[in-house]
Amino acid sequence: NYIFNNNMMSERPEVNKDIFWKQQLSNEVTGRFYAFRKKPINIIKKMEEIKKYCSNNNIKLIFISPPTHVDLQNKINQYNLNKEYILYKEYLKSTGILLDYDVANDITQNSENFNDPYHFSEGIARAIAKDVSVFF
């Protein structure tokens, strides 16, 4: 009953939210997402080019780490990727400005703020847009 696109399930479920939530956190979905993580050498090279271009042209480089529900954040530890995740965020901070919303807090602990563990609600999107707008 699910539509697969690039090996990921559609975020528009035909089942109730609780069932879909559990499916999104399953090894079938989240496990596949985290299972084959490796250092993205090509992406890092491109990022260095972008960083240099922005620096040479006085452009602010801003990254947004969008919020995910803590149920999904906890999967990083489950798949032993905490060290890599910290390095990833440190790299983004060293490259530009990082607005990091993917941290455990009152917002990310409340499932009402999310359509599923990966996707936040429209209200959260508006709050993030307001935060980001101060940079423009």
Task: Annotate the PLM regions.
Residues 42-51, 66-67, 127-136:
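Structured catalytic/translocation cores of nucleotide/phosphate-coupled proteins
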Residues 79, 83-136:
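C-terminal regions of proteins
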Residues 6, 57, 94-95:
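Structured helix-beta-strand junction loops
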Residues 1-53:
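Secreted/periplasmic serine-hydrolase-like ester/acetyl group-modifying domain
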Residues 40, 69, 108-110:
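Alpha-helix initiation/capping motif
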Residues 34-40, 75-78, 114-118:
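Second-shell loop/turn segments in exported
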Residues 51-78:
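Active-site segments of SGNH/GDSL-like serine hydrolases
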